[in-house]
Amino acid sequence: MEHHKTYHSANIKTATGSLLIEGPVSPEDLAGYEFHKDLTAFRPPREQHEALVDIAGLPEGRIIIARDGRTIVGYVTYLYPDPLERWSEGNMEDLIELGAIEVAPDYRGCAVGKTLLTVSMMDEQMENYIVMTTEYYWHWDLKGMKKDVWEYRKIMEKMMNAGGLVWFATDEPEISSHPANCLMARIGKNVSQESIEQFDRLRFYHRYMY
């Protein structure tokens, strides 16, 4: 499968000025930008910056960023699922994972996350994929957002809806371990019925084992 990447962008207004939401961004451009010091949800900022550059260099990898001048203040990543997870077991070339989305605290509350997802889906290539994401409450910044689990889940779900992702049932053990955890996905209009059925088998692994 060829992974065509077509650049799109949008501007959003914030209290301190305008932000550029853009992507997919090349590894070279990503490496040349500053990385906001408060983007620490997954790794220390320098390590996460390097990880984004690596993902952008993958054939299927996509990084959409929010940029204030030359500083990255938010991002969303897309790539094939981790080989250790069940979602990679079918070796589906048209199943990609929204692996991480993060916005620096100073830039929250002005639809940066929603716009990152909206710009992501502007590329016609996304209609060839099933885009999935797994949401686990232990990754959520409940303290920083001053929200309980269910309030945060509602915010997260609404943000994902902006990119066309909706809730899907699954028997995956980690997701099933807490009712706030969830699987969300968007099935592109060009995805084959065969791939949809394969995704169903991955979602309900135990049902199809017997």
From Swiss-Prot:
Pathway assigned to this chain's UniProt record: Ketone degradation; acetoin degradation
Phenotype when the gene is knocked out: Does not impair growth on acetate. Disruption together with other acetoin utilization genes acuB and acuC results in poor growth and sporulation on acetoin or butanediol. Triple deletion of acuA, acuC and srtN improves the growth on acetate but it does not reach that of wild-type under low-acetate conditions.
N-acetyltransferase domain location: 20-161
Resulting phenotype, residue 170 to A: 25% retention of activity. Two to three fold reduction in KM for acetyl-CoA. Three-fold slower turnover number. Retains 60% of the activity of the wild-type after heating it to 100 degrees Celsius for 30 minutes
InterPro entries: AcuA, Acyl_CoA_acyltransferase, GNAT_dom
PROSITE patterns: GNAT (PS51186)
Activity's dependence on pH: Optimum pH is 7.5.
Biological process terms in GO annotation: acetoin catabolic process; butanediol catabolic process; carbon catabolite repression of transcription by glucose; cellular response to acetate; spore germination; sporulation resulting in formation of a cellular spore
Induction: Expression is maximal in stationary phase and is repressed by the addition of glucose to the growth medium. CcpA protein is required for glucose repression. Acetoin does not act as an inducer. Up-regulated during the 80 to 100 minutes of spore germination and into the outgrowth phase.
One Pfam family per UniProt: Acetyltransf_1
One term of GO molecular function: acetyl-CoA synthetase acetyltransferase activity
Temperature dependence: Optimum temperature 37 degrees Celsius. Thermostable. Retains 93, 78 and 15 % of its protein acetyltransferase activity after heating to 100 degrees Celsius for 5, 30 and 60 minutes, respectively.
Annotated TM spans: none
Keywords: Acetoin catabolism, Acyltransferase, Sporulation, Transferase
Regulation: Activity is sensitive to salt concentration, a high concentration of KCL (500 mM) is needed for complete inactivation.
Record-listed E.C. numbers: 2.3.1.-
Domain of life: Bacteria
Membership in a protein family: Belongs to the acetyltransferase family.
Subunit structure: Monomer.
Biological function: Part of the acuABC operon, which is possibly involved in the breakdown of acetoin and butanediol. Acts as an acetyltransferase inactivating acetyl-CoA synthetase AcsA via acetylation at a Lys residue.
Name of the protein this chain belongs to: Acetoin utilization protein AcuA
Organism, as annotated: Bacillus subtilis (strain 168)
Gene from which this protein is expressed: acuA
